[in-house]
Amino acid sequence: MLMMAALPRAASAQDDGVKGGFVLSSAMRAIQIRQRVSPNLAHQLGSAADAGLARELHPRAVVHTQGLLPHEQDRDASVLSQEDWRQTLVQALAWCVTGNPAYEAKAVAYIDAWVAGYSPSFNPIDEADLVDLLLGFDFVQERLSPSTIDKTRQLGRQMATGSLGTRRVGDPSTGLNNWQSHRIKLATAGAYLSGDPALVAAAREGFLAHVSGNIGTEGRTYDFNQRDAMHYVVYDLEPLMMAASIAAAHGDDWYGMASSQGGLAAALRWLKPYAAGDKQHEEFVHSTVRFDARRAAAHVEGYSGLWQREEASNLYWIASRLDPQFIPMASALNAQPVVRALFA
């Protein structure tokens, strides 16, 4: 099932994974990315990295945005901190592609600042993009101090054990919806970085159980039934595809295992007519979650009106690297430069 040209099953890469060497991109894979990224895409990455070079760092002990409208409590400050995680990947990937030492230095600064004292809250919505910090770590780890490397791997272990634990933030439905998808993504990234086979096995078990419980035989997700929104179909599936991609980078075919019983491939096919623009959907009309109504009333963009199919761009680009049936759909959309490069 896997199209492994994009995610090679090199023996050396898998060996590194056992030792906790990387999350998604091994040293061999980094070379491959440099070779595959076009000059135009490299320019786009460089421009994105340049725009972030002057940013101040915003490490915090607590990051919290879940359930808050813009400007409520300290949400705005937490949004700045979450951008640190995303910028780590932008800067590290731009350095991988261009060799500009300023990008490397910025990525290293982010990692040093965050792993020095951050302890995960295990709220998978607040920390959904924390995985970007670890994806950036892949590219610059040889430039980090031994202490920072050790702290980053310890953070990965914390993410895995906490996300897979029995004590979980959120109401019971979060064990079935996108919250669990993000837990699985965070756990998978942390488990492979830790190099602990038991954690990897637990993450795989959680992944397969969640795919089975979240996606119906016809491909409809629990999130669509709960939220009546394509936005949440994408937000549910994208972290699962990232988890499957991380596993694939280590030679483990989670996507094929799940898709053999319908699973992810069925969900992607269910969404495809909407992503292609052949069908339209009015978002959140029958959502059972009260916060969705609050966001719509506050005119938060994307929480009312017709779904915009561009939201699925990154999802189908990632999917196309694991399953060739989705290449045409990925090509028809326009994934973000970071995603196109990361999965070049």
Task: Please annotate each region the language model reported.
Residues 1-13:
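N-terminal export signals
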Residues 13-173, 181, 248, 256-344:
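Extracellular glycan-targeting catalytic surfaces
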Residues 87, 100, 187, 240-243:
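Hydrophobic anchor position in alpha-helical repeat solenoids
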Residues 92, 134, 188, 241-244:
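Short, well-ordered alpha-helical packing segments
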Residues 96-99, 191-195:
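Hydrophobic/aromatic side-chain positions at a characteristic register within alpha-helices
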Residues 173, 177-190, 197:
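Loop-centered beta-sheet repeat module
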Residues 194, 198-282:
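Long, repeat-rich segments with strong aromatic
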